[in-house]
Amino acid sequence: MVSTLPIAYTSELGVLGKKKIELQTNGIIVPPDLVEDLEKNWNAPAIRRGRFVICLESQDDKKLTTVLIINGKFAVNSPYHMIKNGSNYEIWKNDAKYTDIVLMPHPKFYEKVTRDGVPMYEVAVLGEPNHLRSVLNQRCAHHVCGKPCKFCAIENWWAGHPNKTPAQIAETAEAAYQEGIIHHVTLSTGTKASPGKGLEDIVESARLISRKIPVSTTVNFEPMTDYVLLESLLREAKESGATTALCNIECFDSNIREVIMPVKGKLAIDVYDKVWERCLNIFGENEVYTMIITGIGETDESILKGVEFAASRGVVASVVPHTPMIGATYEAMIPPSTERMLYLFEAALPIYEKYGLKLYGGTGGIYTSLKGM
């Protein structure tokens, strides 16, 4: 059903949105001396693995757009590089300044350890301002059986503790909250060989967090066909402070789904539809999200039809560029062009408007950047 809610999007993505995608699809070269500086003084715990977060500040309202940079092999040819100019940090394109950037300070909790001796920076990290993120299990069952999703390198995301416990997650979240730097938590996991595929641990983590601190939580999980178990776990998550659900389909193109996702791709799109329906029944409108990856062999038509399919159900489908990670099967691929991404964004925005969806509306903190996608 088409919504009549008064939601409107500009057809113009804005300067920051365009800069964001330009930097993501090219990568940013960071010289060795700045790698050490960022790791020590700023929020960059995974920079030696090519992953770090910068922010672009609006000159109009000073709001920040978060940019996740993944420097895969493709980034060695990037025209963009970071420099330090006095106390400020800048991105230059070749020999000319491109933009100022804002970095998040190095959190104090990164220097702490959990009660069982695990460094907290190995348990959870700041993914953007006010937002803590953790991946409970970084040993995905699909990787273990030799059938990983070809775009994924979950084991290399950051030097995290490979199998984090809910107690460690809750303790780390409490430390970050007491520092005054988080309002949201996103919990995800590599697939586990369990009935709930790891969602059980996410729910337990949310439950323990809710006992300690008042934050909103996003649960990010793999779909399952045991819908009775799914509903039970999601309702428990909701009761434990989870406000937003993220179940990523990654690709709508039926011609390549099983090629790029040998296990996940066997799940029919109809399964995702049924999972999203249950998420919507529990979490409500504008609280259910999915992600579509661009640049893994799919067609533009499949992406835009996928955005429409999801939106017609009440699900926000975020279109993101494939920035190939080192360690993934597809690590040697090249990201999609900036022009292609901008075209897809421009084409997707009216679809969200048509169905009254808020691209950045999840109260769990997911996609809280106000410009760009």
Annotate each language-model stretch with its function.
Residues H143-V144, D253-R257, I326-T329:
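Short acidic/His/Gly/Ser-rich catalytic and metal-binding motifs that mark active-site loops
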